[in-house]
Amino acid sequence: MNSSTRIFALLGRAVDYSYSPLIHNTAFQALGLPYHYTIFNIAEAALVGDALRGARALGLGGFSVTIPYKQTVVPFLDELSEEATTIQAVNCIVNKNGKLIGYNTDILGFASPLFAYREALHGATIALFGSGGAALAAIEAFQRYFTPKQVLLFARDSQKAKSQLRSSLALERYTNLAIVPLSDYERVRECRLVINATPLGTKGRADGSAIIPLESNLLHSEHIVYDMVYNPTITPLLQAAQAVGASTIFGIEMLIGQAEQAFTLWTGEKMPTELVRQTVMAKLQEL
């Protein structure tokens, strides 16, 4: 890295565990691009605006945005893409000649591994846990790409979740969305697809290992279980799903899917996706 190297970074809080630097630096090096990707941990939301103003002044190339700032960054950007405007959440920022443009590549990144199940999801009920930026992307993905009967959004505080969603979404668009209390988790049994859009299950976290009590035998072989957590590769939720013969989707698929689009937005090049996947999987297997 030298003075002519263009810098890209992940904006988040306590995200040193992230594999985004490995993904993007592998791709930059493979294509011979003079770019470097790093992590910027921002301690509190009040500092996000300062960070983005500094990035503009320093000429940084762009950012990935993760927990908990996907919505926090929105007011500080100069422009939003259509899909980011729709859900008022951003996970990718491009610095285009001093103009910071926000995108949401989570929507298609989330949807991509589900396209193989499109027929199975037609007319189905879906269980979605989480109410942050990742959950917003999932809700919008179902609106754009799939035809479920109903999406059940499980929330610890239903009223708070509804208020949060209303601040980001035009809720009248989502006629099949129902917000239900977390205490109704037994309804998971009736769902075809179960999604974890929370950090629960992430390696090193002390706040629980799964979105539902795994000893409750709610999962069955007809389920498709999608965990957005990617470290560990096989989370406690996915382990429980595999044990009963359910189909599983690993979080690494969404991670790489959204990163692939961000890479193209930053560089105009196509990411060498298979090389990236092999590199990340090899790293995860070392742990």
UniProtKB/Swiss-Prot annotation:
Broad class of enzyme this protein falls into: oxidoreductase
GO CC list: cytosol
Annotated NADP(+) binding sites: 82, 130-134, 228, 251
Classification via CDD domains: NAD_bind_Shikimate_DH
Molecular function terms, GO-annotated: NADP binding; shikimate 3-dehydrogenase (NADP+) activity
GO BP terms in the entry: amino acid biosynthetic process; aromatic amino acid family biosynthetic process; chorismate biosynthetic process; shikimate metabolic process
Coiled-coil stretches noted in the UniProt entry, renumbered to this chain: none
Matches recorded under InterPro entries: Aminoacid_DH-like_N_sf, NAD(P)-bd_dom_sf, SDH_C, Shikimate_DH, Shikimate_DH-bd_N, Shikimate_DH_fam
Keywords on record: Amino-acid biosynthesis, Aromatic amino acid biosynthesis, NADP, Oxidoreductase
Quaternary assembly: Homodimer.
Entry-linked HAMAP family: Shikimate_DH_AroE (MF_00222)
Family label: Belongs to the shikimate dehydrogenase family.
Identification of the protein by name: Shikimate dehydrogenase (NADP(+))
Lineage, top ranks: Bacteria, Pseudomonadati, Chlorobiota, Chlorobiia, Chlorobiales
